[in-house]
Amino acid sequence: MKRTYQPSKIRRARKHGFRHRMSTKNGRRVLAARRRKGRKVLAA
């Protein structure tokens, strides 16, 4: 059986990247929460 996680840099960036997060209200909320927490990396 094929494993479920087949990594792709493009798919990762498009689904979880900074620009995608900024494109929705809830995505911006995620970024704000990560900034508040002091995350070094905000998005993929």
Swiss-Prot record:
Family, as annotated: Belongs to the bacterial ribosomal protein bL34 family.
Entry keyword annotation includes Ribonucleoprotein: yes
GO cellular component: ribonucleoprotein complex; ribosome
Origin superkingdom: Bacteria
PROSITE patterns registered for this protein in UniProt: RIBOSOMAL_L34
Coiled coil segments of this chain: none
Alphabetized UniProt keyword annotations: Ribonucleoprotein, Ribosomal protein
Annotated segments matching region Disordered: 1-44
Gene Ontology terms for molecular function: structural constituent of ribosome
GO biological process assignments: translation
Protein name: Large ribosomal subunit protein bL34
Keyword Ribosomal protein: yes
